[in-house]
Every structure is written in C-alpha cells, then in structure tokens.
Design a protein with these regions (language model features):
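An N-terminal, well-structured beta->alpha segment
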Residues: 1-86, 92-93, 175-209, 217
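Bulky hydrophobic/aromatic "packing anchor" residues in well-ordered structure
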Residues: 13-15, 108, 154
Length: 268
C-alpha cells in the first residue's frame, strides 16, 4: 500500500513522535521519512534531515551569508544522539550553530532575538512523556512560529531530499557553546521590573514556595530565579538529571513527593 504523504508533516506546534534509534532493527531498510510516516517514530536521522531543510529554507529567503541558528533542548535525550543530530543537520546546511544545551523553550527565541540570529530550534516534546521527542522552530521575525504555509514549504523541501547524500556532507558551519550567556540573559530578563509583578524583594520574604520542574528544562533555573526575586524559602522537588520528565504530563501533582514536610521547610 502506498504511503499517503500529507501537505504538512507538522502538527499544531512542530513535530512530535515516539523516539526510535535509526540503528534499531525495526528501522533497517527504511528511510527516515518512511519511518516517520509509516511507523509513527522519529529517529535522529529524521531530525537531522528536518533541520537541514529548515536551515536551507532560511538561507533561501535572505541575503547570501552564514545563517546563525540558536539550538536548545530539554533533558529527555540523555544519550545526546538526537540533539547532536540536530546540531549536525544545521552545520551540514551551512548554518552556524549557537548551542544553548538544556534550556527552557522561551529562551531559544529570546536568545535568538537578543543576538540577531537567523532562526531557532528547540528539541522537545513539551508536556509529552519522556519516550517522545520533537522539534519546535522559530523564525527571525519577532521569534514567531512558522505559519502553515511555511510548514508546507518545509515539507515539500524535505520530500525532495536524499538523506543518503546528506549523511555524506561535511560540516560546513561552526559551533559555539552559549549556555552560560543564555542562562544569564534568561535570569536578567525574568527579573526585569517591567517583566515582574513584584513591587519589592521584601514582598516575598515570608513566602514558602514549592517549585516542581518535573525533571524538565527549568530544573535549577526556576528555583534560582525565585530566590533572586526575594522568595524567603524555595523548595525544589522532582529535580535532577535523568529523571522521569513530565511523568503523567508533569502538572497533575507532585509526582514522587506526596507531601512537603516540616523537616523540608526547616532544612537550611
């Protein structure tokens, strides 16, 4: 039976699927696109192909020069196979990769606009479980998301590609680690008076605040910002590396932490 190819591979906000390694026996003999469409999986090779086409489209729509692309991700890909495939796809397309590493999604367009970059990529499946991953794209105009017509154009470009040829391409663009600069910008932006409802740091001195980042990208970041904002006591739960990201969507309750005890509150 012939595979039906939609006009747009994207859903409401980019692409998301259950992840599967391209080296898995169930993927052998199939192209990244076939695996995506027929089996409903996203492989690291599909991610490389997808962002390669995105960067090529960005280069096509502007004056010829090196495209600078900001790349961030959430912590669900502990192997780094998918995130590194994204960096590789950007560089093979001739893009200069500004790598932020694990950061919250809004920081990608924020850092992109702050630095005058030409595009942004966030590797995440948002609130979906840890066994899934995906890609959100940002455009240089005000950090906007692609319109449906942009998605269609990207899909058409992707359908023309031969991934075997892309695999053999050299890395044309460079790579710069920008995580510390990006996190400093995020904290500064979050604490700006015009972005806050806090009249004075003294306002929150008596507050005890529980922060649950659900083992996601805001682990360690949100809690620190609240401390800097003047919250008297900040308790962070469900934080750390390689945890169950977004267990039961990460918002229903404090998974794995049934109660906040007095000892937790009184601990220095």
């Amino acid at each position: 039976m012939q595979t039906v190819v939609p006009d747009r591979l994207q859903g409401t906000d980019g692409i998301r699927r259950e992840t599967k390694s391209a080296k898995d026996s169930e993927c052998r003999g199939s192209t990244p696109l076939q695996i995506f469409l027929e089996k409903g999986w996203i492989t690291e090779e599909f991610m490389e192909l997808y962002v390669y086409c995105y960067v090529k489209n960005q280069k096509k729509s502007a004056a010829p020069k090196k495209r600078t692309i900001v790349i961030g991700w959430d912590p669900r890909d502990t192997s780094g196979n998918f995130t590194e495939a994204v960096v590789r796809g950007v560089r093979k397309a001739g893009g200069e990769a500004m790598v932020l590493g694990v950061v919250p999604t809004p920081l990608v367009p924020l850092f992109m606009l702050h630095n005058g970059a030409d595009g942004g990529i966030m590797v995440t499946a948002s609130h979906n479980p840890k066994d899934q991953n995906g890609i959100k794209l940002f455009l240089p105009f005000h950090g906007m998301k692609p319109l449906p017509s942009d998605d269609i154009d990207l899909t058409r470009n992707l359908l023309k590609q031969n991934f075997d040829a892309i695999k053999k391409l050299p890395l044309k663009g460079g790579r710069t680690d920008c995580q510390q600069k990006a996190l400093a910008l995020f904290q500064h932006f979050s604490l700006l008076p015009e972005n806050s409802w806090i009249d004075s740091p003294d306002t929150l001195k008596a507050l005890i605040l529980v922060v649950d980042p659900a083992f996601g990208a805001l682990t360690g970041i949100a809690a620190q910002i609240f401390k800097e904002a003047g919250v008297g006591k900040v308790l962070e739960v469900n934080a750390g590396k390689n945890g169950p990201v977004n267990l039961r969507s990460g918002v229903a309750d404090l998974e794995g932490c049934p109660r906040i005890t007095a000892d937790m509150i009184l601990k220095p």
